[in-house]
Structure formats: structure tokens, C-alpha cells
């Protein structure tokens, strides 16, 4: 799926859905076909390997620059239903900065990006590309923290039920949440390295306020790492006490 959006003007941040690619637009690509990838590469001049990179769910967080195109790959959090229970996972998202456009590519539709489409983000403009990247990164941190709080609440509820009566279902749910914390921890630590590198990229140093925003994102990411580690230690302790 390919969606092309453009902010109406400097004074109006509402998005217009376009039929064709224009300078200053945002190209949002979700689970694309090979034909769609070739089309985007041809129309934008972005290397096909940049567009394909996030479609490998094992792709790690990184920054790469080639012929004036910068790709930032970060892991973003998702929720999924599995056996009538909400589970948490991460998938790669590519944010590609070119001279004329911003392109996002992901295997799945993400709340992080639909929030921009649905007008939930203030002062968002598709043509302010470096600021847009930072706003996406900030939204990713927000969802990590939100999902970590959800995991915390779910874990406490399950632990209370387990102490009343040992049930396989609760144990399975607890192990599932532990797995989610491992995914989050790995992804957040990889993202941290990418965010630190982003501070040194020339295109992100144009405006001093952008650097401030990026530093705030790095702080939030560190908070999410700390929350993940604390919750994971508590999980391990709880599972050990239950198996004793």
C-alpha cells in the first residue's frame, strides 16, 4: 500500500491525500509489493535496497547515507492479539530523508504513523522533513512508554491471580509478557545507538531546536530502557519464586 500526503501550507497543517508524488510530500508505504517498491524507487531515485531493508523483520536499527538519501531504521512497538490475549512486539520502520520527500516504509500499519494521518500531532508539516523525523521518533518513544505501563499493569494483575491459584493460562501470559520485554529491551538499546548517531548527522543539525527535540527523544528512550529493565527483573524474580 502506498499513500501520498502533503501538508496544505505553512499556516495549515491539515493533510491532503495526493495521487502523485510532489516535492514536500510524505510517502507512506505499508507491506509493499515488489512492483510498488520498483515504482517508488524509479519515481524518487531512492535505492531499492533502502526501501526493502525494513521488510526484513530481523533488520536492526541503523543510519545509512547514500547519494544524498538518508535512511534511519528504528524498531517500533506493536500490539497484536494472540490466543485472545494482547501481546507486544517490535518491527523495523524505515524513515528515508531525500532532498524532496520523506518516505516511511514498514511491514505493518503502525499507530505511530496513523496518529500523524489522523491529525493527532500538532505543528506537523510534511515539508519540514528533519522536524518530521524527530516527531516520528518522539511518537515511537511515547508508545514504548505507554505499552510498558500496560505491561506493568497486566503483569501485576496476572501475578495476583497466580498467587490465588496456580493456572497454566496465567503462567503462559506471564511468559509471553516476559518475551515482549526482551523484544522491547533489544529494540530500545539498538534505537539508542541510532539516536546518538543521528545527533551527528549534518541534516539534523540545521536548527538548534531540532537538536533539543532529539535530545528529549534520547532521554525518553533511556527512560523506556530503564522501565524495561526494572519490569524484566521483577518478572524474572516472580517466575523464579513461582517455580520454587
Regions of interest found by a model, annotated:
Residues 1-207, 213-227:
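Peripheral, non-transmembrane regulatory/ligand-interaction domains of membrane transport proteins
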Residues 231:
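Function-determining sites in protein domains
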Residues 235-244:
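Single conserved hydrophobic/aromatic residue that forms the stacking wall/gate
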